[in-house]
Amino acid sequence: MIISHSHKYLFLKTVKTAGTSIEAALSQSCSGNDVVTPLNDFSHNRDETGGAVHRAMNADTLPWWNRDQIGQHVDAPTMKRHLPPEVWQGYCKLSIARNPWDRIVSLFAWKTRNDATMKPQKRLIHRLGVPFDELGELRRNFTTFVNRGFETNDRFYILDGELCADVVVRYEQMN
């Protein structure tokens, strides 16, 4: 999430839509009392020298923000509730949307990256000399994942049934 007082915009960061990349790029022009929430400490959030890919700043100055409970994805109702009306109404609200199919595939890969029960057990089965259909198992795991249901990103840019973001960038149209 970014609250840029210097440029008068709010970045409503969605999930699995290149939000971190956009936030990293936007954060480079933030300064002063702008707010940029910190990223989780994953290796892909660091550059080749090990430094952070974006400038986290001032998030701890927000009395309502808590890294463990709110994190870097702050939905529209929460932001509206906590920001002064002149900021919520007067700043440009930016967000990003992604094709739902691409997003769910990305979400599946992200959520299951460390879940051994969702990964094909190819090595074990090959050691036993049993033929293995890795693609079939992956498909079954993906179907199970999709059937559990997943949250949309609507809460970040839709408020009271209406689009509240002034600009919604389509992931597929970025280059």
State what each model feature region is:
Residues M1-N175:
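Membrane-interface amphipathic segments in extracytoplasmic regions
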